[in-house]
Protein backbone atom coordinates (compact mmCIF):
# COMPACT_ATOMS: atom_id res chain seq x y z
CA UNK A 1 0.00 0.00 0.00
CA UNK A 2 1.22 3.48 -0.84
CA UNK A 3 2.43 5.61 2.10
CA UNK A 4 2.62 8.83 0.06
CA UNK A 5 1.09 11.97 1.56
CA UNK A 6 -1.74 13.76 -0.32
CA UNK A 7 0.70 16.51 -1.36
CA UNK A 8 3.13 13.90 -2.79
CA UNK A 9 0.32 12.12 -4.66
CA UNK A 10 -0.89 15.40 -6.22
CA UNK A 11 2.70 16.30 -7.11
CA UNK A 12 3.10 12.92 -8.86
CA UNK A 13 -0.21 13.33 -10.73
CA UNK A 14 0.86 16.85 -11.82
CA UNK A 15 3.70 15.28 -13.82
CA UNK A 16 1.14 13.68 -16.16
CA UNK A 17 -2.18 15.55 -15.81
CA UNK A 18 -2.73 19.29 -16.30
CA UNK A 19 -5.28 21.15 -14.14
CA UNK A 20 -8.21 19.39 -12.39
CA UNK A 21 -6.79 20.19 -8.94
CA UNK A 22 -10.04 19.36 -7.11
CA UNK A 23 -10.17 15.84 -8.56
CA UNK A 24 -6.49 15.25 -7.76
CA UNK A 25 -6.97 16.43 -4.18
CA UNK A 26 -10.01 14.17 -3.68
CA UNK A 27 -8.31 11.00 -4.93
CA UNK A 28 -5.13 11.88 -2.99
CA UNK A 29 -7.10 12.26 0.26
CA UNK A 30 -9.01 9.02 -0.42
CA UNK A 31 -5.74 7.16 -1.05
CA UNK A 32 -4.12 8.58 2.10
CA UNK A 33 -7.20 7.67 4.16
CA UNK A 34 -6.54 4.00 3.25
CA UNK A 35 -3.18 4.29 5.02
CA UNK A 36 -4.64 6.27 7.96
CA UNK A 37 -7.31 3.63 8.54
CA UNK A 38 -4.68 0.88 8.82
CA UNK A 39 -3.02 2.81 11.69
CA UNK A 40 -6.19 2.59 13.85
CA UNK A 41 -6.93 -0.13 16.40
CA UNK A 42 -8.81 -3.12 14.99
CA UNK A 43 -12.21 -2.27 16.50
CA UNK A 44 -12.28 1.29 15.15
CA UNK A 45 -10.68 0.25 11.84
CA UNK A 46 -13.64 -2.02 11.14
CA UNK A 47 -16.06 0.91 11.58
CA UNK A 48 -14.22 3.32 9.24
CA UNK A 49 -15.55 2.81 5.70
CA UNK A 50 -14.18 4.53 2.59
CA UNK A 51 -15.95 7.61 1.18
CA UNK A 52 -16.61 6.72 -2.45
CA UNK A 53 -16.06 9.37 -5.15
CA UNK A 54 -18.08 10.43 -8.21
CA UNK A 55 -16.06 12.38 -10.81
CA UNK A 56 -18.17 14.47 -13.19
CA UNK A 57 -16.73 16.18 -16.25
CA UNK A 58 -16.82 16.32 -20.06
CA UNK A 59 -14.92 13.79 -22.14
CA UNK A 60 -11.17 14.21 -22.59
CA UNK A 61 -10.46 16.28 -19.45
CA UNK A 62 -8.47 13.66 -17.52
CA UNK A 63 -10.92 11.40 -15.60
CA UNK A 64 -9.59 8.13 -17.01
CA UNK A 65 -5.99 9.38 -16.97
CA UNK A 66 -6.29 10.07 -13.23
CA UNK A 67 -7.38 6.44 -12.79
CA UNK A 68 -4.47 5.12 -14.87
CA UNK A 69 -1.89 7.12 -12.92
CA UNK A 70 -3.55 6.29 -9.59
CA UNK A 71 -3.20 2.57 -10.36
CA UNK A 72 0.59 2.96 -10.54
CA UNK A 73 0.78 5.07 -7.36
CA UNK A 74 -1.60 3.01 -5.22
CA UNK A 75 0.61 -0.08 -4.84
CA UNK A 76 -2.66 -1.85 -4.01
CA UNK A 77 -5.12 -4.09 -5.90
CA UNK A 78 -6.70 -1.81 -8.52
CA UNK A 79 -9.08 -2.44 -11.39
CA UNK A 80 -10.70 -0.13 -13.96
CA UNK A 81 -13.97 -1.29 -15.53
CA UNK A 82 -16.49 0.15 -17.99
CA UNK A 83 -20.02 0.30 -16.57
CA UNK A 84 -21.47 -0.37 -20.04
CA UNK A 85 -20.05 -3.92 -20.17
CA UNK A 86 -22.36 -5.28 -17.47
CA UNK A 87 -25.95 -6.50 -17.45
CA UNK A 88 -28.38 -7.43 -14.71
CA UNK A 89 -27.98 -10.89 -13.13
CA UNK A 90 -29.88 -13.52 -15.12
CA UNK A 91 -29.37 -11.89 -18.53
CA UNK A 92 -26.71 -12.52 -21.17
CA UNK A 93 -23.58 -10.50 -20.36
CA UNK A 94 -21.14 -9.96 -17.51
CA UNK A 95 -22.54 -9.56 -14.02
CA UNK A 96 -21.09 -6.97 -11.64
CA UNK A 97 -19.69 -9.61 -9.24
CA UNK A 98 -17.03 -10.30 -11.88
CA UNK A 99 -15.49 -6.90 -10.93
CA UNK A 100 -14.46 -8.32 -7.55
CA UNK A 101 -13.29 -11.60 -9.12
CA UNK A 102 -11.07 -9.69 -11.56
CA UNK A 103 -9.81 -7.49 -8.71
CA UNK A 104 -8.88 -10.62 -6.72
CA UNK A 105 -7.08 -12.10 -9.75
CA UNK A 106 -5.04 -8.91 -10.12
CA UNK A 107 -4.23 -9.02 -6.38
CA UNK A 108 -3.02 -12.63 -6.70
CA UNK A 109 -0.65 -11.59 -9.52
CA UNK A 110 0.56 -8.56 -7.55
CA UNK A 111 1.23 -10.55 -4.36
CA UNK A 112 2.93 -13.35 -6.34
CA UNK A 113 5.33 -10.83 -7.94
CA UNK A 114 6.07 -9.34 -4.51
CA UNK A 115 6.68 -12.81 -2.98
CA UNK A 116 9.00 -13.82 -5.83
CA UNK A 117 10.91 -10.53 -5.42
CA UNK A 118 11.19 -11.17 -1.67
CA UNK A 119 12.66 -14.64 -2.27
CA UNK A 120 14.88 -13.59 -5.18
CA UNK A 121 18.16 -13.74 -3.20
CA UNK A 122 17.58 -17.35 -2.06
CA UNK A 123 16.34 -18.28 -5.53
CA UNK A 124 19.54 -16.88 -7.10
CA UNK A 125 21.68 -19.02 -4.77
CA UNK A 126 19.68 -22.17 -5.60
CA UNK A 127 19.79 -21.42 -9.35
CA UNK A 128 23.56 -20.94 -9.12
CA UNK A 129 23.95 -24.36 -7.45
CA UNK A 130 21.88 -26.04 -10.19
CA UNK A 131 24.03 -24.47 -12.92
CA UNK A 132 27.22 -25.56 -11.11
CA UNK A 133 25.78 -29.10 -10.83
CA UNK A 134 25.30 -29.07 -14.63
CA UNK A 135 28.86 -27.81 -15.21
CA UNK A 136 30.54 -30.08 -12.62
CA UNK A 137 28.23 -33.01 -11.84
CA UNK A 138 28.65 -34.09 -8.16
CA UNK A 139 30.22 -37.50 -7.42
CA UNK A 140 27.70 -40.34 -7.04
CA UNK A 141 27.65 -43.23 -4.53
CA UNK A 142 27.05 -46.93 -5.30
CA UNK A 143 23.29 -46.36 -5.50
CA UNK A 144 23.65 -43.64 -8.13
CA UNK A 145 22.75 -40.84 -5.72
CA UNK A 146 24.72 -37.58 -5.49
CA UNK A 147 27.03 -37.53 -2.48
CA UNK A 148 26.85 -34.60 -0.08
CA UNK A 149 30.27 -32.99 0.21
CA UNK A 150 31.24 -31.04 3.33
CA UNK A 151 33.39 -28.53 1.41
CA UNK A 152 32.93 -27.46 -2.23
CA UNK A 153 35.79 -28.60 -4.46
CA UNK A 154 38.38 -26.11 -5.72
CA UNK A 155 37.11 -26.61 -9.30
CA UNK A 156 33.54 -25.80 -8.21
CA UNK A 157 34.70 -22.65 -6.44
CA UNK A 158 36.67 -21.57 -9.53
CA UNK A 159 33.59 -22.07 -11.73
CA UNK A 160 31.42 -20.19 -9.20
CA UNK A 161 33.79 -17.20 -9.43
CA UNK A 162 33.71 -17.27 -13.26
CA UNK A 163 29.91 -17.60 -13.22
CA UNK A 164 29.51 -14.55 -10.97
CA UNK A 165 31.89 -12.51 -13.10
CA UNK A 166 29.89 -13.33 -16.25
CA UNK A 167 32.72 -15.21 -17.99
CA UNK A 168 30.48 -18.24 -18.64
CA UNK A 169 27.39 -16.34 -19.87
CA UNK A 170 27.64 -17.58 -23.47
CA UNK A 171 28.50 -21.20 -22.62
CA UNK A 172 25.75 -23.72 -23.46
CA UNK A 173 24.54 -26.22 -20.87
CA UNK A 174 21.74 -28.77 -20.65
CA UNK A 175 19.45 -28.45 -17.64
CA UNK A 176 16.10 -29.86 -16.55
CA UNK A 177 13.39 -27.20 -16.41
CA UNK A 178 9.74 -27.52 -15.43
CA UNK A 179 7.70 -28.13 -18.58
CA UNK A 180 5.30 -25.33 -19.49
CA UNK A 181 1.72 -26.13 -18.41
CA UNK A 182 -0.55 -27.50 -21.11
CA UNK A 183 -2.16 -24.49 -22.78
CA UNK A 184 -5.92 -24.91 -23.17
CA UNK A 185 -7.78 -21.86 -24.44
CA UNK A 186 -11.52 -21.90 -23.76
CA UNK A 187 -13.69 -19.17 -25.26
CA UNK A 188 -16.04 -18.04 -22.50
CA UNK A 189 -19.69 -17.33 -23.30
CA UNK A 190 -20.91 -14.10 -21.63
CA UNK A 191 -21.37 -14.54 -17.88
CA UNK A 192 -19.45 -17.87 -17.75
CA UNK A 193 -15.91 -16.48 -17.31
CA UNK A 194 -15.53 -17.88 -13.77
CA UNK A 195 -16.38 -21.45 -14.80
CA UNK A 196 -14.11 -21.40 -17.86
CA UNK A 197 -11.16 -20.05 -15.82
CA UNK A 198 -11.61 -22.94 -13.36
CA UNK A 199 -11.69 -25.42 -16.27
CA UNK A 200 -8.48 -23.91 -17.66
CA UNK A 201 -6.77 -24.24 -14.26
CA UNK A 202 -7.85 -27.89 -14.07
CA UNK A 203 -6.49 -28.73 -17.53
CA UNK A 204 -3.21 -26.93 -16.82
CA UNK A 205 -2.70 -28.96 -13.64
CA UNK A 206 -3.22 -32.28 -15.45
CA UNK A 207 0.37 -32.23 -16.73
CA UNK A 208 1.79 -32.30 -13.18
CA UNK A 209 5.27 -31.00 -12.45
CA UNK A 210 7.09 -32.71 -15.32
CA UNK A 211 10.65 -31.66 -16.08
CA UNK A 212 12.09 -31.39 -19.54
CA UNK A 213 15.81 -31.18 -20.52
CA UNK A 214 16.70 -28.02 -22.44
CA UNK A 215 19.92 -26.66 -23.98
CA UNK A 216 20.44 -23.00 -23.15
CA UNK A 217 23.12 -20.38 -22.73
CA UNK A 218 24.00 -19.94 -19.06
CA UNK A 219 22.71 -16.34 -18.86
CA UNK A 220 19.30 -17.46 -20.23
CA UNK A 221 19.22 -20.57 -18.04
CA UNK A 222 19.96 -18.44 -14.97
CA UNK A 223 16.86 -16.26 -15.53
CA UNK A 224 14.56 -19.27 -15.97
CA UNK A 225 16.03 -21.12 -12.99
CA UNK A 226 15.67 -18.08 -10.71
CA UNK A 227 11.98 -17.81 -11.68
CA UNK A 228 11.45 -21.54 -11.13
CA UNK A 229 13.20 -21.61 -7.74
CA UNK A 230 11.45 -18.43 -6.56
CA UNK A 231 8.06 -19.91 -7.53
CA UNK A 232 8.87 -23.02 -5.42
CA UNK A 233 9.48 -20.81 -2.37
CA UNK A 234 6.01 -19.23 -2.61
CA UNK A 235 3.32 -20.84 -0.45
CA UNK A 236 0.09 -20.89 -2.55
CA UNK A 237 -2.26 -20.87 0.47
CA UNK A 238 -0.47 -17.97 2.16
CA UNK A 239 -0.41 -16.14 -1.17
CA UNK A 240 -4.21 -16.52 -1.59
CA UNK A 241 -4.91 -15.29 1.94
CA UNK A 242 -2.55 -12.34 1.59
CA UNK A 243 -4.17 -11.38 -1.75
CA UNK A 244 -7.71 -11.58 -0.32
CA UNK A 245 -6.66 -9.43 2.67
CA UNK A 246 -5.11 -6.89 0.27
CA UNK A 247 -8.35 -6.72 -1.76
CA UNK A 248 -10.56 -6.37 1.32
CA UNK A 249 -8.43 -3.73 3.07
CA UNK A 250 -6.80 -1.77 0.22
CA UNK A 251 -8.71 -2.63 -3.00
CA UNK A 252 -9.74 0.20 -5.34
CA UNK A 253 -12.36 -0.13 -8.11
CA UNK A 254 -12.64 2.58 -10.78
CA UNK A 255 -15.96 2.47 -12.68
CA UNK A 256 -15.82 4.52 -15.87
CA UNK A 257 -18.76 5.69 -18.03
CA UNK A 258 -21.24 5.40 -15.14
CA UNK A 259 -23.45 8.03 -16.81
CA UNK A 260 -24.17 5.54 -19.61
CA UNK A 261 -26.16 3.32 -17.20
CA UNK A 262 -28.56 6.12 -16.18
CA UNK A 263 -32.19 5.53 -17.15
CA UNK A 264 -33.23 7.78 -20.04
CA UNK A 265 -36.83 8.86 -20.42
CA UNK A 266 -39.86 6.68 -19.90
CA UNK A 267 -39.32 3.15 -21.16
CA UNK A 268 -41.42 0.06 -20.68
CA UNK A 269 -39.95 -3.36 -20.00
CA UNK A 270 -36.85 -4.37 -18.06
CA UNK A 271 -33.81 -2.05 -18.29
CA UNK A 272 -31.21 -4.81 -17.89
CA UNK A 273 -28.10 -2.89 -18.87
CA UNK A 274 -28.91 0.40 -17.12
CA UNK A 275 -31.03 0.58 -13.98
CA UNK A 276 -30.61 -3.17 -13.46
CA UNK A 277 -26.82 -2.74 -13.33
CA UNK A 278 -27.18 0.14 -10.86
CA UNK A 279 -29.26 -2.08 -8.57
CA UNK A 280 -26.65 -4.85 -8.80
CA UNK A 281 -23.87 -2.37 -7.99
CA UNK A 282 -25.60 -1.30 -4.75
CA UNK A 283 -24.63 -4.31 -2.58
CA UNK A 284 -21.04 -4.23 -3.91
CA UNK A 285 -20.61 -0.55 -3.03
CA UNK A 286 -22.46 -0.87 0.29
CA UNK A 287 -20.57 -4.02 1.32
CA UNK A 288 -21.29 -7.69 0.68
CA UNK A 289 -19.45 -11.00 0.33
CA UNK A 290 -18.53 -12.22 -3.16
CA UNK A 291 -17.52 -15.80 -3.92
CA UNK A 292 -14.34 -16.13 -6.03
CA UNK A 293 -12.25 -19.16 -6.99
CA UNK A 294 -9.65 -18.01 -4.42
CA UNK A 295 -12.15 -17.68 -1.53
CA UNK A 296 -14.82 -15.36 -0.16
CA UNK A 297 -14.11 -11.61 -0.48
CA UNK A 298 -15.84 -8.91 1.60
CA UNK A 299 -16.33 -5.59 -0.18
CA UNK A 300 -17.08 -3.43 2.91
CA UNK A 301 -13.76 -1.53 2.75
CA UNK A 302 -13.10 -1.45 -1.00
CA UNK A 303 -12.90 2.12 -2.36
CA UNK A 304 -15.13 2.80 -5.39
CA UNK A 305 -14.40 5.74 -7.70
CA UNK A 306 -17.00 6.31 -10.44
CA UNK A 307 -16.71 8.74 -13.33
CA UNK A 308 -18.87 9.94 -16.17
CA UNK A 309 -19.28 12.81 -18.64
CA UNK A 310 -22.99 13.33 -17.76
CA UNK A 311 -23.57 15.27 -20.99
CA UNK A 312 -26.96 13.69 -21.70
CA UNK A 313 -27.84 12.37 -18.23
CA UNK A 314 -27.37 14.11 -14.87
CA UNK A 315 -25.92 12.66 -11.64
CA UNK A 316 -29.46 12.92 -10.21
CA UNK A 317 -30.59 10.39 -12.88
CA UNK A 318 -28.71 7.67 -10.99
CA UNK A 319 -31.00 5.77 -8.63
CA UNK A 320 -31.10 7.55 -5.22
CA UNK A 321 -29.55 4.62 -3.33
CA UNK A 322 -26.46 4.67 -5.57
CA UNK A 323 -26.18 8.47 -5.33
CA UNK A 324 -26.08 8.13 -1.55
CA UNK A 325 -23.23 5.62 -1.78
CA UNK A 326 -21.08 8.06 -3.79
CA UNK A 327 -20.96 10.93 -1.27
CA UNK A 328 -17.94 12.85 -2.61
CA UNK A 329 -18.70 14.74 -5.85
CA UNK A 330 -15.86 16.23 -7.87
CA UNK A 331 -16.46 18.35 -10.97
CA UNK A 332 -13.73 18.44 -13.61
CA UNK A 333 -13.58 21.58 -15.72
CA UNK A 334 -13.54 21.79 -19.52
CA UNK A 335 -10.08 22.55 -20.91
CA UNK A 336 -9.08 26.00 -22.19
CA UNK A 337 -6.49 27.05 -24.80
CA UNK A 338 -3.97 27.67 -21.99
CA UNK A 339 -4.57 24.13 -20.68
CA UNK A 340 -3.90 22.75 -24.18
CA UNK A 341 -0.61 24.68 -24.33
CA UNK A 342 0.44 23.24 -20.98
CA UNK A 343 -0.62 19.71 -22.04
CA UNK A 344 1.66 20.00 -25.09
CA UNK A 345 4.71 21.01 -23.05
CA UNK A 346 4.54 20.22 -19.32
CA UNK A 347 3.82 16.48 -18.80
CA UNK A 348 6.83 14.13 -18.56
CA UNK A 349 6.02 12.37 -21.83
CA UNK A 350 3.96 15.04 -23.58
CA UNK A 351 2.75 14.46 -27.16
CA UNK A 352 5.38 16.83 -28.57
CA UNK A 353 8.17 14.97 -26.72
CA UNK A 354 6.85 11.70 -28.17
CA UNK A 355 6.84 13.04 -31.75
CA UNK A 356 10.36 14.47 -31.35
CA UNK A 357 11.63 11.11 -30.06
CA UNK A 358 9.89 9.17 -32.87
CA UNK A 359 11.35 11.39 -35.60
CA UNK A 360 14.81 11.30 -33.95
CA UNK A 361 14.91 7.55 -34.71
CA UNK A 362 14.98 8.53 -38.42
CA UNK A 363 17.65 11.20 -37.81
CA UNK A 364 15.18 14.10 -38.12
CA UNK A 365 15.38 16.87 -35.52
CA UNK A 366 11.96 18.41 -34.77
CA UNK A 367 11.71 21.69 -32.88
CA UNK A 368 8.36 23.03 -31.63
CA UNK A 369 8.50 26.79 -31.03
CA UNK A 370 6.36 28.63 -28.47
CA UNK A 371 4.31 30.27 -31.24
CA UNK A 372 3.81 26.87 -32.91
CA UNK A 373 2.57 25.30 -29.66
CA UNK A 374 0.18 28.21 -29.12
CA UNK A 375 -1.24 27.91 -32.65
CA UNK A 376 -1.74 24.12 -32.28
CA UNK A 377 -3.59 24.69 -28.99
CA UNK A 378 -5.79 27.37 -30.59
CA UNK A 379 -6.59 25.11 -33.57
CA UNK A 380 -7.56 22.20 -31.28
CA UNK A 381 -9.74 24.44 -29.11
CA UNK A 382 -11.40 26.00 -32.17
CA UNK A 383 -12.29 22.60 -33.66
CA UNK A 384 -13.67 21.48 -30.27
CA UNK A 385 -15.89 24.57 -30.17
CA UNK A 386 -17.26 24.22 -33.71
CA UNK A 387 -17.72 20.42 -33.72
CA UNK A 388 -17.88 17.91 -30.87
CA UNK A 389 -15.86 18.80 -27.75
CA UNK A 390 -13.61 15.78 -27.14
CA UNK A 391 -11.19 17.60 -24.86
CA UNK A 392 -7.46 16.89 -24.93
CA UNK A 393 -7.95 13.96 -27.33
CA UNK A 394 -8.40 16.57 -30.07
CA UNK A 395 -4.68 17.41 -29.74
CA UNK A 396 -3.82 13.91 -31.00
CA UNK A 397 -5.91 14.29 -34.16
CA UNK A 398 -4.61 17.81 -34.84
CA UNK A 399 -0.96 16.84 -34.29
CA UNK A 400 -1.30 13.67 -36.35
CA UNK A 401 -2.61 15.75 -39.25
CA UNK A 402 0.13 18.36 -38.76
CA UNK A 403 2.92 15.76 -38.69
CA UNK A 404 1.57 13.60 -41.52
CA UNK A 405 3.94 14.90 -44.25
CA UNK A 406 7.01 14.78 -41.99
CA UNK A 407 6.18 11.24 -40.80
CA UNK A 408 5.73 10.06 -44.39
CA UNK A 409 8.98 11.60 -45.69
CA UNK A 410 11.07 11.11 -42.52
CA UNK A 411 13.34 8.44 -44.05
CA UNK A 412 14.32 10.90 -46.83
CA UNK A 413 14.92 13.79 -44.40
CA UNK A 414 17.78 12.15 -42.48
CA UNK A 415 20.03 14.76 -40.85
CA UNK A 416 17.61 17.64 -41.41
CA UNK A 417 16.15 19.97 -38.79
CA UNK A 418 12.51 21.09 -39.02
CA UNK A 419 11.02 23.93 -36.99
CA UNK A 420 7.29 23.86 -36.34
CA UNK A 421 6.23 27.47 -35.71
CA UNK A 422 2.95 29.38 -36.05
CA UNK A 423 3.50 29.86 -39.80
CA UNK A 424 4.07 26.12 -40.39
CA UNK A 425 0.94 25.24 -38.35
CA UNK A 426 -1.22 27.82 -40.15
CA UNK A 427 -0.04 26.58 -43.56
CA UNK A 428 -1.02 22.98 -42.76
CA UNK A 429 -4.13 23.43 -40.61
CA UNK A 430 -5.88 26.76 -41.25
CA UNK A 431 -7.90 25.58 -44.26
CA UNK A 432 -9.13 22.51 -42.36
CA UNK A 433 -9.94 24.40 -39.15
CA UNK A 434 -11.83 27.17 -40.99
CA UNK A 435 -14.00 24.77 -43.00
CA UNK A 436 -16.40 23.23 -40.50
CA UNK A 437 -17.38 20.36 -42.81
CA UNK A 438 -13.73 19.39 -43.38
CA UNK A 439 -12.77 19.67 -39.71
CA UNK A 440 -15.80 17.57 -38.72
CA UNK A 441 -14.59 14.65 -40.85
CA UNK A 442 -10.80 15.06 -40.76
CA UNK A 443 -9.99 16.61 -37.37
UniProtKB/Swiss-Prot annotation:
| The keyword NADP belongs to this UniProt entry's keyword annotation | no
GO MF entry, a single one: proteasome-activating activity
Compartments annotated for it: namely: Cytoplasm
Q: Which GO terms describe its cellular component?
A: HslUV protease complex
One Gene Ontology term of the biological-process aspect is: proteolysis involved in protein catabolic process
Q: Name one Pfam family in it.
A: AAA_2
**Which keywords has UniProt assigned to this entry?**
ATP-binding, Chaperone, Cytoplasm, Nucleotide-binding
Positions annotated to bind ATP: 18, 60-65, 256, 321, 393
Q: Which family does it belong to?
A: Belongs to the ClpX chaperone family. HslU subfamily.
Q: How does it assemble?
A: A double ring-shaped homohexamer of HslV is capped on each side by a ring-shaped HslU homohexamer. The assembly of the HslU/HslV complex is dependent on binding of ATP.
Q: Which purpose does this protein serve, as stated in its record?
A: ATPase subunit of a proteasome-like degradation complex; this subunit has chaperone activity. The binding of ATP and its subsequent hydrolysis by HslU are essential for unfolding of protein substrates subsequently hydrolyzed by HslV. HslU recognizes the N-terminal part of its protein substrates and unfolds these before they are guided to HslV for hydrolysis.
Annotated PANTHER family: ATP-DEPENDENT CLP PROTEASE ATP-BINDING SUBUNIT CLPX-LIKE, MITOCHONDRIAL-RELATED, ATP-DEPENDENT PROTEASE ATPASE SUBUNIT HSLU
- Name the UniProt record assigns to this protein: ATP-dependent protease ATPase subunit HslU
Gene that encodes it? hslU
Amino acid sequence: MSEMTPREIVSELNKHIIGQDNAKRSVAIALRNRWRRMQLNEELRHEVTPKNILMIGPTGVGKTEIARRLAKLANAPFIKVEATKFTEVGYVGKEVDSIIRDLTDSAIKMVRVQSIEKNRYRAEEMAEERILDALIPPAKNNWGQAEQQQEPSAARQAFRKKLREGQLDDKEIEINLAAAPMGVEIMAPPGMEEMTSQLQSMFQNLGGQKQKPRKLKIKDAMKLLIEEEAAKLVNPEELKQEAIDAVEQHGIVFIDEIDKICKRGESSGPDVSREGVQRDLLPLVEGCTVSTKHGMVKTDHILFIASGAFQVAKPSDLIPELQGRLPIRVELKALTTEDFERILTEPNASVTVQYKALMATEGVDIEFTESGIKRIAEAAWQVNETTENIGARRLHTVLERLMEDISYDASDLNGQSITIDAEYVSKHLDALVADEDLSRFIL
